[in-house]
């Protein structure tokens, strides 16, 4: 009936959107012959093409340098964070493989879990890739990375110097994912 009526569901448009991002940065430098500093901040937001997918990065750094006659000491500290949300719609290829005569929801607006092809057996079915997004899932990650580098250089004379570098780094990760009992991964269990 849908074929005869010219029905053509846009499965490719269902999980997608126009993604627009933004980037901002600020850099400040200053000092004197002996002391110098550099501070920077940046923010980068990327809105993914799949609905519900986005990334936000924030980075900041501070550098201080002392340059004496024989001694040079510099310290650089940087902190970066990343917040990431994956699309609840899953893979785009799942939507590209869908039959255009199927709809993601039934007449009452309820999500359809699986479809059977009218010319195939009852045991041959296709999962609705939109189903899991409609039942409320999320998958988010976040990390914070802190780095510190201290460099010391002592000029013994014009031809020789001694230098040392100490660097420390620490990363904190957090992940949060949720799928309700009605999620397709629990079907039949």
Model-derived features: positions:
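Surface-exposed loop/interface segments of Gram-negative outer-membrane beta-barrel transport/assembly proteins
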Residues: 1-7, 48-53, 59-147, 163-189
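Membrane-embedded beta-strand positions in outer-membrane beta-barrel channels/transporters
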Residues: 23-25, 59-61, 147-149, 153
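Outer-membrane beta-barrel strand-turn architecture
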Residues: 31-32, 67-70, 154-160
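Beta-sheet entry/capping signal
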Residues: 25, 159-164
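Residues embedded in well-ordered regular secondary structure
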Residues: 1-51, 87-91, 131-139, 153-155
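Generic alpha-helical hydrophobic packing signal
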Residues: 36, 41, 66-68, 77-79, ...
């Amino acid at each position: 009936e849908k074929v005869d009526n010219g029905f053509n569901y846009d499965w490719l448009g269902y999980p997608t959107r126009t993604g627009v991002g933004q980037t901002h940065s600020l850099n400040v430098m200053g000092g004197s012959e002996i002391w110098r500093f550099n501070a920077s901040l940046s923010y980068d937001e990327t809105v993914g093409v799949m609905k519900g997918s986005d990334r936000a990065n924030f980075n900041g750094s501070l550098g201080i340098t002392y340059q004496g006659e024989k001694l040079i000491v510099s310290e650089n500290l940087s902190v970066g964070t990343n917040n990431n949300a994956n699309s609840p719609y899953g893979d785009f290829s799942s939507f590209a493989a869908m039959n255009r005569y199927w709809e993601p929801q039934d007449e009452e607006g309820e999500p359809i879990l699986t479809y059977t092809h009218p010319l195939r057996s009852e045991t041959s079915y296709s999962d609705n890739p939109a189903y899991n997004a409609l039942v409320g899932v999320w998958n988010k990650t976040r990390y914070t990375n802190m780095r510190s580098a201290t460099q010391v250089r002592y000029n013994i004379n014009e031809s020789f110097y001694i230098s040392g570098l100490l660097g420390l780094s620490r990363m904190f990760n957090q992940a949060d994912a949720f799928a309700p009992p009605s999620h397709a991964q629990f079907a039949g269990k």
